[in-house]
């Protein structure tokens, strides 16, 4: 193929012979944190190429100069189209994307727990069959206790997670394959070539060069302040600030404040604040230009030389580049002898600047959701020291409905103070209503409970609609405790059921008023201890029935007053004994007295002794 410039473009597609396609022209768009897009216009002598041999198959574009390889780009064919057929050739068009692009076709909702961001990204890549990836990380990234991919593509989730963690990614190419590399610092980027500045329009005979270069500065955010809250340290202000060090040409008063900052600990807050500042200032100092250097790609740098402004003759990091190549010789009947050309336009920042992506949209949960309380096998109640529980969401296909299904989730209670309030721990199997703080799927909180077909209400409805009940269930048993209110007119009732013990503590007075009858039934023993006085007042009759023995112990005096008659009937013996004093039995007209020495005195109007036998000594 005749070519006066020494340039040549070739392409390999799947298992097809290398000569199947000729490259007519191509457009290659590359940028940090984006899957590249390669558009190929092709020509072939075959008018009916099998789409199955091309679509979703590997494809590699090679750029040659004087027989030496200058650049390669490999990926998979995401779109393939057949165009017009000429005298000897048929036109085709192919769109080539990296394997990472496939993750944009996979939408999911899932939970990652206690994993670092690079481990989460690795899982997603490997599930998509991508094993050629690398991490060039220079900073520590904390373990994420709970990280949710919520109704978003795997690619969108990776982009979001990478942006939150200050990561950026780019592609590197080797023979027949490409690698996605994740980095967090400009120091990890590969150093590229020196490119001299050349205003003239020349070929590659003198080497690759930059023919246009422009530099701009823009007033941008000067400072970032991020704040968050942790219930574990409620009084501590999780606030972090970061001021840019490159504010010579603008004011320092442009502060970006945001809440929540999406962190719960100081190390993460400090790092996230710096990442946010870098992202907001990504456009503060930028350059752009045009060149004929095929090797320019994101993830690398080049050093500009021979520019009239010496301030520009330094190392620049490529943020984005758009390559364009034309090879009209591929269409021999239409070429008109035009040469093969390659050019590009690029966007750069200083090589010492770490470029970071702006935070993309994070999916929000539009409203409350239903979940089921879960825990380890054999348990009925499972919580931590804060009363938090584990949940299984209906949309989580990976959870096993056990103690690993979610993070510990806080539970809203009706009243919560310092060691006082109302607490009721949702139990395993209960259905709960879950809300999300700020709509963030990473921050669930239980705000309600609901019955369902498997867990019905304590009483059948609507038959018992007038009842308000607080009924518990014995842990690993069949009993219950209950406080119930019946509000049916004429049947109003307050009912208390204690499955075992009932303890009442009153630190001051207690009053009980019963307008009708009061019945108490004690199945075992009863003990009443009164520290001071006790008064029992019965306005009518009192009946005391003791089927066993009765013992009355009085430490001091005992007084019994009967306004009418008193009758004492004993079927066997009666014993009256005064151990150290006198005994006196008296009426209005006389008495019988026995003193402590045993002397008996009888006083009265008369004395009658009747008996079969009377002995007097």
Swiss-Prot record:
Gene3D superfamilies: 2.30.110.50, 4.10.220.110, Baseplate protein-like domains, Gp5 N-terminal domain
SUPFAM superfamilies: gp5 N-terminal domain-like, Phage fibre proteins, Phage tail proteins
Annotated spans, Disordered: 449-469
InterPro entries: Gp5/Vgr_OB (IPR006531), Gp5_Vgr_C (IPR054030), T6SS_RhsGE_Vgr_subset (IPR017847), T6SS_Vgr_RhsGE (IPR006533), T6SS_VgrG/RHS (IPR050708), Vgr_OB-fold_dom_sf (IPR037026)
Signal sequence, start to end: none
Disruption phenotype: A double vgrGA-vgrGB deletion inhibits the ability of RhsB to inhibit cell growth. VgrGB alone restores RhsB-mediated cell growth.
Pfam families: Gp5_trimer_C (PF22178), Phage_base_V (PF04717), Phage_GPD (PF05954)
Function field: A Vgr protein that is probably part of a type VI secretion system (T6SS). May be required for export of proteins involved in Rhs-mediated cellular contact-dependent growth inhibition (CDI).
Assigned protein family: Belongs to the VgrG protein family.
Name the UniProt record assigns to this protein: Putative type VI secretion system protein VgrGB
Organism: Dickeya dadantii (strain 3937)
């Amino acid at each position: 193929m005749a070519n006066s410039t020494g340039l040549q473009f070739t392409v390999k597609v799947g298992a097809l012979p290398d000569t199947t396609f000729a490259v007519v022209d191509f457009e290659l768009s590359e940028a940090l944190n984006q899957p590249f897009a390669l558009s190929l216009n092709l020509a072939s002598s075959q008018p009916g190429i099998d789409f199955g041999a091309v679509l979703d198959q590997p494809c590699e574009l090679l750029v040659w100069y004087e027989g030496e390889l200058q650049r390669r780009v490999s990926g998979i064919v995401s779109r393939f189209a057949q165009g017009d057929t000429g005298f000897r050739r048929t036109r085709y068009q192919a769109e080539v994307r990296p394997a990472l692009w496939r993750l944009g076709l996979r939408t999911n909702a899932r939970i990652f727990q206690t994993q670092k961001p690079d481990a989460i990204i690795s899982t997603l890549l490997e599930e998509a069959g991508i094993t050629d990836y690398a991490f060039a990380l220079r900073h520590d990234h904390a373990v994420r206790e709970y990280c949710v991919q919520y109704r978003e593509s795997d690619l969108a989730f990776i982009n979001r997670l990478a942006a939150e963690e200050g990561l950026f990614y780019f592609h590197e190419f080797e023979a027949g394959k490409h690698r996605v590399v994740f980095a967090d610092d400009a120091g990890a980027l590969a150093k590229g070539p020196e490119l001299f500045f050349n205003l003239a329009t020349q070929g590659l005979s003198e080497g690759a060069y930059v023919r246009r270069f422009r530099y701009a500065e823009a007033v941008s955010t000067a400072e970032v302040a991020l704040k968050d809250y942790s219930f574990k340290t409620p009084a501590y202000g999780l606030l972090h600030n970061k001021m840019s060090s490159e504010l010579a040409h603008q004011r320092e008063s442009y502060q970006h404040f945001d809440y929540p900052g999406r962190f719960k600990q100081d190390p993460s807050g400090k790092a996230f604040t710096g990442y946010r500042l870098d992202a907001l200032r990504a456009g503060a100092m930028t350059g752009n230009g045009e060149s004929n250097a095929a090797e320019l790609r994101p993830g690398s740098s080049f050093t500009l030389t021979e520019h009239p402004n010496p301030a520009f003759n330094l190392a620049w990091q490529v943020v984005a580049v758009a390559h364009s190549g034309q090879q009209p010789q591929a269409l021999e009947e239409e070429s008109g002898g035009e040469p093969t050309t390659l050019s590009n336009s690029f966007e750069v920042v200083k090589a010492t600047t770490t470029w970071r992506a702006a935070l993309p949209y994070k999916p929000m949960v539009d409203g409350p959701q239903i979940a089921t309380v879960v825990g380890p096998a054999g348990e009925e109640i499972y919580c931590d020291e804060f009363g938090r529980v584990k949940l299984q969401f209906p949309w989580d296909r990976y959870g096993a409905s056990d103690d690993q299904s979610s993070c510990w989730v806080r539970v809203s209670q009706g009243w919560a103070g310092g060691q006082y309030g109302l607490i009721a721990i949702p139990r395993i199997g209960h259905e709960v209503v879950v809300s999300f703080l700020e709509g963030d799927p990473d921050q669930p909180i239980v705000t309600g409970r609901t019955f369902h077909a498997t867990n019905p209400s304590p009483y059948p409805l609507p038959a018992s609609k007038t009842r308000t009940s607080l009924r518990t269930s014995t842990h690993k048993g069949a009993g219950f405790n209950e406080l119930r209110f019946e509000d049916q007119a004429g049947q109003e009732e307050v009912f208390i059921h204690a499955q075992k013990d009932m303890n009442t503590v009153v630190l001051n007075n207690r009053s009980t008023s019963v307008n009708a009858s009061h019945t108490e039934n004690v199945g075992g023993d009863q003990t009443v201890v009164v520290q001071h006085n006790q008064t029992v007042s019965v306005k009518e009759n009192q009946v005391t029935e003791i089927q066993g023995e009765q013992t009355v112990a009085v430490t001091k005096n005992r007084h019994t007053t009967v306004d009418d008659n008193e009758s004492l009937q004993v079927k066997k013996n009666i014993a009256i004994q005064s151990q150290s004093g006198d005994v006196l039995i008296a009426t209005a007209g006389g008495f019988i007295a026995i003193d402590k020495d045993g002397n008996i005195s009888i006083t009265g109007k008369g004395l009658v002794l009747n008996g079969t036998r009377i002995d007097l000594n």
